[in-house]
């Protein structure tokens, strides 16, 4: 584990321990609504404080971009951390174990390091550009399925901005008719890690934020998968529209999506 990932993991583990304690008494967790179906809790905020303080101490010249508190550090910094202190807040608040801490490091705008930590399972996904992806120190690879009708596809519903719900449901209906099934588990970082391990053969979602997808996308890429936007291009981090899959089914997924967008 290189120094960047070591620092990230130590901070994520501390934040994860705090989450596990909080999960034992959810009635005491204070929650606010940022928008319709978009919640934030004091657990999100406390996790972010732990992560930001650790990164600032280790790397005072790095920029840090967070879901809850925005940007820290110089805008022109060569290194930038993108972190989601609690991906899957709604899951967490309902006692569902599918939530994670997501941390990615960019150098001059290029993803270099990624860590996704799932506290309930104590699962640590990580990747370094050009060096592969790991789950709990074991190398992971995307699936090798070819036929779409044998593939399991992950996705996420557009519950915050529902303006494109009809279009999304048309896409989902098409996928459900042509695949082995779909899953909506509520934490994009872990959905992407599921692609990286082969548990999902593909994943798609619209209108996500950089902290939702930056770390998971690099983990998919380093596990042998491909990540694109809905047009098959490389603009997914900017647009928030993402498709991730093993190389053998990506084109089939894009064909279905393109018929509706």
UniProtKB/Swiss-Prot annotation:
Q: Where does substrate bind?
A: 67, 86-89, 183, 212
Q: Which domain of life is it from?
A: Bacteria
Q: Name one Pfam family in it.
A: Inositol_P
Q: Which reaction does it catalyse?
A: a myo-inositol phosphate + H2O = myo-inositol + phosphate
Cellular component annotations (GO), alphabetically ordered: cytoplasm
SUPFAM superfamilies for the chain: Carbohydrate phosphatase
Where does this protein reside within or beyond the cell?
Cytoplasm
GO function term, MF aspect, one: RNA binding
InterPro entries named in the record = IMPase, Inositol_monoP_metal-BS, Inositol_monophosphatase-like, Inositol_monophosphatase_CS, Inositol_monophosphatase_SuhB
**Amino-acid positions noted as binding Mg(2+) in the UniProt annotation, renumbered to this chain:** 67, 84, 86
Cysteine pairs forming cystine bridges in this chain are none
- GO BP terms in the entry: inositol metabolic process; phosphatidylinositol phosphate biosynthetic process; ribosome biogenesis; signal transduction; transcription antitermination
Q: What is the E.C. number?
A: 3.1.3.25
Asked whether the UniProt record includes Chaperone among its keywords, one would answer yes
Q: Where is the signal peptide?
A: none
Cofactor dependence is on: Mg(2+)
What does this chain do?
A: Might be part of the processive rRNA transcription and antitermination complex (rrnTAC). The complex forms an RNA-chaperone ring around the RNA exit tunnel of RNA polymerase (RNAP). It supports rapid transcription and antitermination of rRNA operons, cotranscriptional rRNA folding, and annealing of distal rRNA regions to allow correct ribosome biogenesis. This subunit may play a central role in organizing the structure.
- Family membership, please give it: Belongs to the inositol monophosphatase superfamily.
Description of how the protein assembles with itself and partners: Homodimer. The rRNA transcription and antitermination complex (rrnTAC) consists of RNA polymerase (RNAP), NusA, NusB, NusE (rpsJ), NusG, SubB, ribosomal protein S4, DNA and precursor rRNA; S4 is more flexible than other subunits.
Question: What is this protein identified as?
Answer: Putative Nus factor SuhB
Its gene name is suhB
């Amino acid at each position: 584990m290189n120094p960047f990932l070591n620092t990230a993991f130590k901070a994520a583990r501390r934040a994860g321990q705090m989450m596990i304690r909080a999960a034992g008494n959810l009635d005491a967790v204070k929650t606010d609504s940022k928008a319709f179906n978009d919640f934030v809790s004091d657990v999100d905020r406390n996790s972010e404080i732990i992560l930001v303080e650790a990164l600032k101490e280790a790397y005072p010249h790095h920029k840090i971009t967070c879901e809850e508190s925005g940007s820290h550090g110089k805008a022109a910094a060569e290194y930038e951390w993108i972190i989601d202190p609690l991906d899957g807040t709604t899951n967490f608040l309902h006692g569902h174990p599918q939530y994670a801490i997501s941390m990615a490091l960019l150098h001059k705008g290029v993803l270099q390091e990624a860590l996704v930590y799932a506290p309930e399972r104590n699962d640590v996904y990580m990747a370094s550009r050009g060096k592969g992806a790991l789950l709990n120190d074991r190398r992971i690879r995307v699936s090798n399925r070819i036929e779409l009708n044998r593939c399991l596809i992950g996705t996420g519903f557009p519950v915050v901005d529902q303006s494109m719900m009809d279009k999304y449901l048309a896409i989902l209906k098409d996928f459900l008719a042509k695949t082995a099934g779909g899953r909506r588990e509520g934490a994009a970082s872990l959905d992407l890690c599921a692609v990286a391990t082969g548990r999902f053969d593909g994943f798609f979602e619209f209108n996500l934020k950089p902290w939702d997808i930056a770390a998971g996308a690099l983990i998919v890429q380093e596990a042998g998968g491909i990540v694109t936007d809905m047009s098959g291009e490389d603009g997914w981090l900017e647009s928030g529209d993402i498709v991730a899959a093993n190389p053998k089914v990506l084109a089939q997924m894009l064909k279905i999506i393109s018929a509706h967008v």
